[in-house]
Regions:
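Histidine- and aromatic-rich segments of cupredoxin/plastocyanin-like copper-binding domains
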Residues: 121-143, 231, 235-389
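N-terminal, post-signal-peptide metal-ligating segments of extracellular/periplasmic oxidoreductases
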Residues: 1-135, 148, 246-276, 310-313, ...
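Divalent metal-coordination and catalytic microenvironments
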Residues: 48, 94, 114, 181, ...
Length: 531
């Protein structure tokens, strides 16, 4: 595993981006970019290429094999996909080319629709599942096929129009995002083939510079000591070739856990603080991670962000992190506590019953060691990073009376006809199931029946606040890390989650869905429109 994440750097796009889709130059027929005059002309330019890469090695015991990845114009062959660094107040246009082979072998589909999870962007740049494209094919919500599509990421905080301050509400900042394919019915196989990468957003508080002289800056550990880690379980056939079950609608449990595309990798660190950004990349498994010594003694760390959003205060001396699919957790580990030569492991102790993707079963020690960490050197310079006592303040919640006056929408997640439904219906991309006024504040109730399944539910476009959790009508305490802003909410049996949602700054079509990727591909999704 590389000791430094590979970053995506800016480029010059030719032909230059335009407000309307440049179909004459080969762009897919998307709708016009919203707020183009405000953000388009000054946007920084980047490009990514979805392409097949030959010779990827998951582990030396496995044969080289083709995978699908997002690549920079000049590919870094040490990683599956580059990490994007971006900043609030600096809009960017990312041109995403589809260079996948049209006549590929194996699972997946060579069309793409790239979703930046959970960016606050116009719907035309959100990676709507029907916006998939290739040079010869267009999804139902596009007007023409194309070899590329421009995504305008305005990099404004939610509340831009409300506050009229030119940037939005800094308390609504996102931090750890990830981009992935979101093609209708093929999200799971395309992600399993490799179409996923990290996207990190910074601002004046979380500036990505531990030496930042700005007194407001948090000075958290920064690149190259800010390390994103994706965890995905995968199946391999007897010959060591990546395999995907294209039949089961329930979910998939892999026999190996891959970390940033590698099986049992080693991360070598210096004796100093690191920020580790953990992502459950799916498709179906839940994880509960512990940092342990070789004798399985648990080591403490500091929990600073949930679903990519900084908490208002760090949670000190934590011992584990539990993640459903698409959930993220940022933790800070101080490796200065350990002498050079120390070996540590990140272990998953959360089990599922064999071949049962319904829900996690139980926590069992010692668990599976999925990542080896070796403290192998002194830091080259003094560690100036810190974890301050206060991180990012949370926007205040409405009063009890204000909450009582808000509109409430109810969404039941259940199995139906061997598929997956929301309020008894399967996905229909042509018809919105909810029309939400732009600027609205609403309560969305997410719940399930007694069917034995957990559903990590993702709502596109804005973060939500978990107001309450009840099981069988009894209040359940909200964990400290879940009291911040979230975009994935795990529903279990007979449980009702009340989530406060806002819908600001952009209009258009978005989706809510179960992020168990198999459930998502088997119709557990609905379209909602901001109008």
């Amino acid at each position: 595993m590389p000791n430094e994440p590979a970053l995506l750097y800016g480029s010059t796009l030719n032909p230059p981006p335009t407000e309307l889709a440049n179909t004459a130059a080969g762009e897919a027929g998307r709708p016009a970019h919203q707020r183009w005059a405000e953000f388009g002309p000054q946007a920084e330019h980047y490009e990514l290429h979805a392409a097949q890469r030959e010779g990827w090695v998951f582990n030396p015991a496995y044969p080289p094999q083709p995978v699908w990845t997002f690549q920079a114009a000049v590919a870094d062959l040490s990683v599956l996909s580059p990490v994007v660094h971006s900043h609030y107040g600096h809009p960017m246009i990312c041109r995403i080319y589809n260079d996948l082979p049209a006549n590929h072998t194996g699972f997946g589909t060579p069309e793409i629709s790239t979703h930046l999870h959970n960016a606050h962007v116009g719907s035309e740049s959100d990676g709507f599942p029907g916006d998939y494209y290739s040079p010869t094919k267009a999804g139902p919500s596009l007007t023409a096929p194309g070899g590329f599509k421009d995504h305008l990421y305005s990099n404004i905080y939610a509340g831009y129009d409300e506050l009229q301050n030119g940037i939005g509400d800094y308390r609504e900042a996102l931090g750890t995002l990830f981009y992935h394919d979101h093609t209708l019915d093929f999200t799971a196989p395309n992600i399993v083939r490799g179409l996923m990468g990290f996207f990190l957003l910074f601002d004046h508080l979380d500036s990505g510079n531990e030496k930042d002289p700005n007194p407001a800056a948090l000075r958290l550990p920064s690149h190259p000591y800010d390390y994103p880690l994706s965890f995905c379980d995968r199946r391999f056939d007897p010959n060591g070739i990546l395999y995907y079950d294209q039949v089961s609608p329930e979910g998939i449990l892999g026999d190996k856990t891959i970390v940033n595309g590698k099986i049992q990798p080693v991360l070598r660190v210096a004796r100093r603080k690191y920020r580790l950004r953990l992502l459950n990349g799916g498709p179906s498994r839940f994880y509960q991670f512990y940092l342990v010594r070789p004798n399985n003694v648990i080591q403490p760390f500091t929990y600073i962000a949930n679903d990519g959003n900084l908490l208002d205060k760090p949670l000190l001396n934590q011992t584990n992190v539990r993640l459903g699919v698409a959930e993220r957790a940022d933790i800070v580990v101080d490796f200065s506590r350990y002498p050079v030569g120390t070996e540590l492991y990140l272990a998953n102790r959360l089990t599922h019953r064999p071949e049962d993707t319904r829900r996690p079963y139980q926590v069992v020690a010692p668990g599976e060691w999925v990542l080896k960490i070796v403290v192998d050197r002194e830091p080259p310079e003094q560690d100036l990073s810190q974890v301050p006592a206060n991180l990012r303040p949370l926007p205040p919640l409405p009063t009890t009376a204000q909450l009582a006056a808000l509109p409430v929408r109810k969404f039941l997640f259940e199995r139906r006809q061997n598929m997956w439904a929301i309020n008894g219906q399967f996905i229909n991309l042509n018809t919105p199931r909810a029309l939400v006024p732009m600027g609205a504040m609403e309560i969305w109730e997410l719940y399930s029946v007694d069917d034995g399944w957990d559903h990590p539910v993702h709502i596109h476009f804005e973060e939500g606040r978990l107001l309450s959790k009840t099981t069988d009508g009894r209040n359940v305490a909200i964990a400290a890390h879940e009291k911040g802003r979230k975009d994935v909410f795990n529903i279990t049996d007979r449980t009702v989650l009340r989530v406060l949602m806002r819908f600001r700054d952009y209009k258009g079509k978005y989706v809510m869905h179960c992020h168990n990727l198999i459930h998502e591909d088997h119709a557990m999704m609905l379209r909602f429109d901001i109008v």
